[in-house]
């Protein structure tokens, strides 16, 4: 299947906001220059997610990701995808109050070419988000199932199952929008509730495990390409059996080495 490239035009905050009700946004994670370069002219935005702590570093959750780690990977992504709109997840513990949040976001802006930061939290984080946006930091919000809360909430739990939770999620989205966020990730939320959230605000809602009626979708690249074999969330679609293809290729390489068919005369100096 050939890849049809449209005339590539880098996204910015205005274009992202204007996509509401006009264009479905495609967001994908990346953690290094190689994959970022592959994705940059296809996806609308690249997220350097703290999910790298799991899929890249092999940790059980995202909580031990550090700011230094996120800055390192964001620089790698920006080096590989110089024209992409890049968002960095602010890791757990880096935005516990207004001053700490601003200090760490300024450090991100100084050390990387990231276009925006992403912060988990709703009404409880609205004051912090407002402080950041008032000081020229572009913020993407994140509500619903929030991976940085996994230990305090006892696991990954789908949100929006009760009327009370539905109303809280809508309040969260409205509060984050009023605080100045340009977009919000809504994760692990019942699809009918995610649709109501999308309709309740004027900024794009990017869904992950939140149904088809959001303004766009985000997936972790290793999930989407079938590299993570241990577990497949219900909301993930494998567009490639990446793990099997890689193992087959490496196995063939090993066989070629053992039977001396690699390198060939054509591959020698």
Curated annotation (Swiss-Prot):
Pathway: Cofactor biosynthesis; (R)-pantothenate biosynthesis; (R)-pantoate from 3-methyl-2-oxobutanoate: step 1/2
Gene Ontology CC annotations of this record: cytoplasm
UniProt keyword annotation of tRNA-binding present: no
Keyword Cytoplasm included in the entry's annotation: yes
GO biological process: pantothenate biosynthetic process
Paired cysteines (S-S): none
GO molecular function: 3-methyl-2-oxobutanoate hydroxymethyltransferase activity; magnesium ion binding
Catalytic activity: 3-methyl-2-oxobutanoate + (6R)-5,10-methylene-5,6,7,8-tetrahydrofolate + H2O = 2-dehydropantoate + (6S)-5,6,7,8-tetrahydrofolate
EC class name: transferase
Binding site for 3-methyl-2-oxobutanoate: 50-51, 89, 118
Cofactor note: Binds 1 Mg(2+) ion per subunit.
Chain sites annotated for binding Mg(2+): 50, 89, 120
EC number: 2.1.2.11
Cofactor(s) the protein requires to work: Mg(2+)
Catalytic-site annotation from UniProt: 187 (proton acceptor)
InterPro entries: Pantoate_hydroxy_MeTrfase (IPR003700), Pyrv/PenolPyrv_kinase-like_dom (IPR015813), Pyrv_kinase-like_dom_sf (IPR040442)
Taxonomy, superkingdom: Bacteria
Assembly description: Homodecamer; pentamer of dimers.
Biological role stated in the UniProt entry: Catalyzes the reversible reaction in which hydroxymethyl group from 5,10-methylenetetrahydrofolate is transferred onto alpha-ketoisovalerate to form ketopantoate.
Annotated family: Belongs to the PanB family.
Protein name, UniProt field: 3-methyl-2-oxobutanoate hydroxymethyltransferase
Lineage: Bacteria, Pseudomonadati, Campylobacterota, Epsilonproteobacteria, Campylobacterales
């Amino acid at each position: 299947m050939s890849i049809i490239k449209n005339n590539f035009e880098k996204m910015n905050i205005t274009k992202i906001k204007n996509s509401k009700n006009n264009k479905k946004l495609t967001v994908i994670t990346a953690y290094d220059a190689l994959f970022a370069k592959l994705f940059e002219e296809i996806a609308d935005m690249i997220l350097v997610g703290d999910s790298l702590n799991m899929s890249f570093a092999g940790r059980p959750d995202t909580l031990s990701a550090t700011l230094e780690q996120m800055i390192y990977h964001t620089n790698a992504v920006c080096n590989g995808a110089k024209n992409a709109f890049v968002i960095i997840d602010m890791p757990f513990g880096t935005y516990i109050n207004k001053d700490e949040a601003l200090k760490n976001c300024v450090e991100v802006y100084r050390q990387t070419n990231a276009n925006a930061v992403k912060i988990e939290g709703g009404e409880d984080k609205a004051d912090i988000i407002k402080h950041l946006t008032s000081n020229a930091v572009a913020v993407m919000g994140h509500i619903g199932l929030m991976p940085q809360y996994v230990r305090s909430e006892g696991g990954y739990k789908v949100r929006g199952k009760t009327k009370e939770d539905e109303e809280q999620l809508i309040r969260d989205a409205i509060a984050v929008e009023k605080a100045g966020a340009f977009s919000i990730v809504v994760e692990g939320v019942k699809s009918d509730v995610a649709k109501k959230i999308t309709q309740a605000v004027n900024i794009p809602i990017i869904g992950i495990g939140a149904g088809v009626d959001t303004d766009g979708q985000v997936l972790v690249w290793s999930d989407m390409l079938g590299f993570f074999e241990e577990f497949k969330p219900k909301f993930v679609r494998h567009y490639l059996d990446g793990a099997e293809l890689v193992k087959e290729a490496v196995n063939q390489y090993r066989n070629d080495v053992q039977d001396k068919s690699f390198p060939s005369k054509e591959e020698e100096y």
